[in-house]
Structure formats: structure tokens, C-alpha cells
Amino acid sequence: MSSGASASALQRLVEQLKLEAGVERIKVSQAAAELQQYCMQNACKDALLVGVPAGSNPFREPRSCALL
């Protein structure tokens, strides 16, 4: 039974390796350049870089009532 289990495990491993071999790969330098370009294009939308407008910030301290 151990040989049957190991044979099925090896079969699953072979199938997984076939799937991984078919994955399209790119060079790290190309991936880094694309990531840098994406970051530069979307920097204007990044709240950590440009901040959050005070009117739409859900985490700001609530104002107290002026009548009290």
C-alpha cells in the first residue's frame, strides 16, 4: 500500500511540475521595470503619498457640537 501511495504522490508531483513548466516567465529586470512604471502611474492615487482629504477621512476625530 505504501508503494501505491507513493506512486500516486509521484503522479501528482509530475502533474504539478508539468503545470509549473507551462507558466510563462519573464526576466526579473522586466518585472521590476513594469512594477516601477505601475507605481509611478498610480502614485497620484496613493493615499500614503498624497494624503487623504480631511472631508472624506473616515478615521478623523469627530467634531464636538458647538452648541454644548
Swiss-Prot record:
Pfam families referenced in this protein's UniProt entry, alphabetically: G-gamma
Gene3D superfamilies xref list: Transducin (heterotrimeric G protein), gamma chain (4.10.260.10)
SMART domains cross-referenced by the UniProt entry: G_gamma, GGL
Residues modified to Cysteine methyl ester: 65
Keyword Lipoprotein attributed: yes
Lipid-acceptor residues (S-geranylgeranyl cysteine): 65
Membrane topology, record value: Lipid-anchor
Residue span(s) of the pro-peptide: 66-68
N-acetylserine: residues bearing it: 2
Superkingdom as given in the UniProt entry: Eukaryota
Cellular component GO terms held in the UniProt record: heterotrimeric G-protein complex; plasma membrane
Tissue: Abundantly and ubiquitously expressed.
Alphabetical keyword list: Acetylation, Cell membrane, Lipoprotein, Membrane, Methylation, Prenylation, Transducer
Molecular function terms from GO: G-protein beta-subunit binding; GTPase activity
Primary role: Guanine nucleotide-binding proteins (G proteins) are involved as a modulator or transducer in various transmembrane signaling systems. The beta and gamma chains are required for the GTPase activity, for replacement of GDP by GTP, and for G protein-effector interaction. Interacts with beta-1 and beta-2, but not with beta-3.
Protein family (similarity comment): Belongs to the G protein gamma family.
Quaternary structure note: G proteins are composed of 3 units, alpha, beta and gamma.
Protein name stated in the entry: Guanine nucleotide-binding protein G(I)/G(S)/G(O) subunit gamma-10
